[in-house]
């Protein structure tokens, strides 16, 4: 790749006004959000929330251009928080994809002007199907608004774009409205972390909320007998690489554990170590986790008791493995 494709960001002088422009844009968008919050029509929002809550089908988003991109995000947020939803492109809908829509679906149509041709072309068909329509627009007197069952206005003075052309403030406001509706539904549906995890099984949260310790535990638990010597205990802790060792009774059951910390504390108070046994050093009745414990519960228990490793037991109370907080 030639040097001209790798410009040195220190070689060019940036006009200080550009930084001022960045600050101004952020300030203007923030002010627009504040203005929307103050001017929103609570009656219209109540109607919209009721329509979403009582929808028996899908909440379908549609918009052209940048409004379409925002609509996709809004749909994804609704779907991931318990409200079945998908996005449909208005042009594709007008050429066959209307077949994806059932009479039980609720449509949210996005158009800042309220006069987007591709959006307006959908309205007669939607009304014929019997669908309810929610309009998100900056023009409460637009054709779209007049044909909607509920209208959420942006109350925007102008776009942040210096030419008042590129969708900037309007997309920010629309995105915020989508998030506000989704959050309201989370409250209404009492949508909890466990519910969220069901729709995000591949993410970190989903793993922690849906995975049990039996699924991730290590089965090879370092162990010593009650009469094991101090030297044997150290060797087993070292070779086991877990920072602890399980102490077994005569029947192979759990008698206790010895951690690195237990060893240090024992060494501080005992003068003679050559005759010490595991029974003298161990912590009796250590904390354990049932195999069906969720990972998130295991993490909470470890953090509460300030430990990094816990033994896992089966229904017969036999040790079957161990789990670490960083597994």
Swiss-Prot record:
Residue stretches making up the SIS domain: 48-191
Assembly, per entry: Homotetramer.
Source organism of the structure: Escherichia coli
Coiled-coil boundaries: none
Record: residues binding substrate: 82-83, 89, 95, 121-130, 155-157
Matching InterPro entries: CBS_dom, CBS_dom_sf, GutQ/KpsF_isomerases, KdsD/KpsF-type, SIS_dom, SIS_dom_sf, SIS_Kpsf
Gene Ontology terms: biological process: lipopolysaccharide biosynthetic process
Protein's name according to its UniProt entry: Arabinose 5-phosphate isomerase KpsF
CDD domains: CBS_pair_SIS_assoc, SIS_Kpsf
Domain CBS: 217-273, 282-327
Record-listed ATP binding positions: 63-68
Site (Catalytically relevant): 66, 118, 159, 200
Protein family according to the UniProt entry: Belongs to the SIS family. GutQ/KpsF subfamily.
Enzyme class label: isomerase
Organism superkingdom: Bacteria
Protein's job: Involved in the biosynthesis of K-antigen capsules. Catalyzes the reversible aldol-ketol isomerization between D-ribulose 5-phosphate (Ru5P) and D-arabinose 5-phosphate (A5P).
Record field: catalytic activity: D-arabinose 5-phosphate = D-ribulose 5-phosphate
